[in-house]
A protein has these predicted regions:
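Amphipathic alpha-helical segments
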Residues: 59-75, 148-150, 241-258, 340-348
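Hydrophobic, helix-prone linear segments
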Residues: 1, 21, 28, 34-111
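Conserved small-residue-rich
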Residues: 50, 55, 64, 226-265
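ER-lumen resident redox/N-glycosylation machinery signature
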Residues: 38, 80-81, 105-126, 176-177, ...
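Long, well-ordered mid-to-C-terminal structural blocks that present hydrophobic/aromatic surfaces
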Residues: 256-315, 320-322
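Vicinal oxygen chelate
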Residues: 2-45, 47-59, 79, 90-92, 99, 113-154, 171-175, 230-241, ...
């Protein structure tokens, strides 16, 4: 994960991408924040993403294991049984982040994460279901925690983590006021496996194992298992006024750098990207994408501009919107691999929000699935061609954003 050269990592002076203009505040504080992070040693001590944490409603985790086993490279590993949650560990390998899939046992259970859901109409429809955040690798958890607390970042106490059935060998921040996600820190020797403790009795649940095996058999039958790669990026949506603060906050808590922002005027939004400062592929530590409106919803009636991002946030609250996975470059069955994968999954009844957008000439093709009825998360597939290094084209992201906005509008009408 790290080596002695990490102490010399530099987070500033890296190439900037995009055409979005930021405020003077952002451009002033960005280099100051990154330089201070490098200078105090946090950049060197904080590594990539070790795990993602997702919670679902009582009785729904087995079905979500099936969904993820079919649509992603993840494998069911074990289940940890704690007083208020079942936590299923899903893993590709030790070179990609785990997924901690948590199922609440009691539908009447309340905690801080349910309270965040209850504030928003769509979030309240699934009161327990939400993406919690990421766990990051650190070389010295105690020192990182001390430095971050000195910088006024707040963390759950070990007793609070135990009460929440979250691993106490991980230091976890309080939910962000800008994204409502958390960031955790876990210390682990690079040559050891990830362990989350003490989360109760560890076992392989027969129902989970059976469901997982059937989904993987179907994935193999559809001939798509070797085409779907690890996570490429994680995309969060927030309010327009919080865009720059959300970026600076994540940069302060991680060892990522600001890759750049693109203005998407057709959708009244921007797409903003942060990447690991280490020269590692996104499969090892996914990029973080933040999307926000250019103008807040309170002036939409004046200009009549589209507002799919702000509408999503108004309905669900600031949160993760989609998980993007890479698709291996190439062709199968006379189709580009991404088209082959999408057609195969669609044949099993899984919906997609639009046709695959982009082209080989443009450098990449992308598509959004329909939102999961269990987690509300969208799966994005991305196939890059040749040496294309970006995460989207402006035309692609405009069409994807519009399609997601149409789906959210239809869901709202049905309620």
């Amino acid at each position: 994960m790290t080596n002695p050269s990490d102490a010399k990592l530099k987070s500033t002076g890296l190439p900037r991408n995009g055409d979005k203009l930021n405020s003077d505040f952002f451009e002033t504080y960005l280099p100051r924040l990154l330089e201070e992070r490098d200078r105090c040693g946090l950049t060197g001590m904080i590594g990539g993403i070790e795990a993602l944490m997702i919670t679902v409603e009582p009785g729904n985790s087995i079905e979500y294991i099936a969904e993820l086993a079919l649509m992603t490279p993840y494998h069911y590993l074990v289940t940890l049984d704690s007083p208020r949650h079942l936590t299923h560990i899903l893993r590709i390998d030790m070179n990609s982040p785990d997924i901690l899939l948590r199922e609440v046992k009691d539908p009447d259970y309340h905690d801080i994460f349910r309270n965040l859901n209850d504030l928003h109409p769509s979030g309240a429809q699934r009161p327990h279901s939400r993406y919690l955040g990421e766990i990051l690798w650190v070389s010295n958890r105690e020192q990182v925690l001390e430095l971050q607390q000195a910088r006024e970042f707040r963390f759950f106490s070990p007793d609070a983590l135990a009460e929440l059935d979250l691993p106490t060998n991980v230091s976890i921040s309080k939910p962000s006021p800008y994204t409502q996600n958390v960031v955790g820190y876990m210390e682990r020797h690079p040559n050891t496996v990830r362990v989350y403790h003490p989360l109760g009795n560890c076992s392989i649940l027969p129902q989970a194992q059976d469901t997982y095996e059937k989904a993987k058999e179907l994935q193999k039958k559809l001939d798509i298992g070797d085409l779907i790669g690890p996570i490429d990026h994680l995309a969060t949506r927030g309010y327009s006024q919080n865009r720059e603060a959300a970026l600076l906050e994540y940069l302060a808590l991680s060892s990522y750098y600001y890759w750049g922002s693109y203005n998407i005027p057709d959708q009244n939004s921007s797409t903003n990207v942060c990447k690991s400062v280490r020269p590692v592929p996104e499969s090892v530590s996914p990029a973080k994408v933040f999307t926000a409106n250019n103008l807040p919803y309170c002036v939409n009636h004046l200009d009549g501009l589209p507002s799919p991002t702000e509408t999503f946030v108004s309905n669900f609250g600031p949160r993760l919107h989609h998980i993007a996975l890479t698709v291996k470059d190439g062709e199968r069955g006379g189709k580009e691999n991404i088209d082959f994968v999408v057609d195969a999954i669609a044949s099993q009844g899984k919906g997609f929000l639009l046709e695959v957008v982009g082209s080989r000439d443009a450098g990449l093709k992308q598509i959004f699935s329909a939102a999961s009825p269990i987690s509300a998360l969208i799966i994005e597939y991305v196939q890059r061609f040749g040496n294309f290094q970006g995460f989207f084209t402006k035309d692609n992201v405009a069409r994807l954003t519009a399609a997601a906005g149409v789906e959210e509008s239809l869901v709202k009408i049905k309620r």
